Amino acid sequence: MESLFFAMRIITLLFLLINSSVFANFQMNENMQKTYIHIINLEFDKANELLWTEQKDNPTNKIIILQENYIDFLTIIIGEDEAFFTAAKDKKSDRIDFLQAGDDSSPYYLYAQAEVHLQWAFARLKFEEYLTAAYEIQKAYSLLEKNQENFPDFKLNKKGLGFLHTLVGAIPNKYQWVLSLAGMEGSVASG
């Protein structure tokens, strides 16, 4: 009887280990929180060191991609280097695909995709790719709205939606019809 119990424990442990390594995840762990602090302090070398460590130790963590995208976004916005922008924008599609392969029951699943779209929208605005930027803003908006429905207590949704509602609300009334066509609404007050 003990050997059967032992065998069941081993099988259960193997199942958990296999599932945790096979299924993609979103872990905003301590390492990723430190990385974020380095990024917002524009300490990209330190952030990249932590990202490399996380990639080695936890390669299925989808937050890595979000942080890498944030570094590229800030590099583009601050550096205004069109060559870097052109080279980096090829990564966007792969990053979205990678995030979409994640755990869709996580509040980070849609949020991370929305953040990538939003960051690229503003990078594109910087280099006058207005039509694509508008599409990306609309995509980010719809992803955040859906995530807000699914995870109403997830605070990061409120950050993104607040920003977008303020942005939408600041658009002059004579252009609000365009936003209606895109399914977007908001106001400075609601943002």
What do the PLM-derived regions correspond to, one by one?
Residues 53-54:
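Hydrophobic alpha-helical membrane-insertion signals
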Residues 10-19:
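Sec-dependent N-terminal signal peptides
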Residues 28-30, 38-50, 68-190:
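Short coil/linker segments at helix-helix boundaries
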Residues 22-26:
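Boundary at the C-terminal end of the N-terminal hydrophobic targeting segment
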Residues 1-11:
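Positively charged n-region of N-terminal signal peptides that target proteins for export
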Residues 64:
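N-terminal glycine-rich anion-binding loops that anchor highly charged ligand groups
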